[in-house]
Amino acid sequence: MAESEINNNDGEPVFAVLTQYLKDLSFENPSAPRSLRPREKAPQIDININVNANPIGDDNYDVVLSLSVKASDDSETLFHVELIYGGVFHIKNIPQEHVMPLVFIECPRLLFPFARQIISDATQNGGFPPLWIDPIDFAALFQKRVAEEQKNSQTLSS
């Protein structure tokens, strides 16, 4: 997006991806080459995802997806991938009540396909079939986060 478009002063809503970045990637294959042998059943895949965001400067937010994917077969860990993938978003002239949903739903939704591809490539480069993570309902994650924050604030005020 052109600098003049980001810095418009006419009050039009602005939502722009300024940059995306890979902050951290770890792939562990602790039992290789034994873990690469053909298996009779699919491994158990455990996926944990977290979304964090921090304001940086005026109207910019650093949004970070943290994914941890662990594949195991019985008691053996086949692989463990950890990824931290982020983006900086420019959000301006958006009503305040819409900013946090935009930051915690739309921003991670835009980042997710890139993070998903990195994890797929890492598992394939590690000698396993590519792992395609199913799409994630970031709206549900945001609603859960809001409900937990409300519950915690009620607990603290009691």
Swiss-Prot record:
Pfam families: SecB. GO terms for cellular component: cytoplasm. This is Protein-export protein SecB. Homotetramer, a dimer of dimers. One homotetramer interacts with 1 SecA dimer. It comes from the Bacteria. One of the proteins required for the normal export of preproteins out of the cell cytoplasm. It is a molecular chaperone that binds to a subset of precursor proteins, maintaining them in a translocation-competent state. It also specifically binds to its receptor SecA. The keyword Chaperone applies. Belongs to the SecB family. One of its GO terms (biological process) is protein folding. The keyword Magnesium does not apply. InterPro entries: SecB, SecB-like_sf. SUPFAM superfamilies: SecB-like. It is found in: Cytoplasm. It comes from Bartonella henselae (strain ATCC 49882 / DSM 28221 / CCUG 30454 / Houston 1). GO terms for molecular function: unfolded protein binding. Keywords: Chaperone, Cytoplasm, Protein transport, Translocation, Transport.
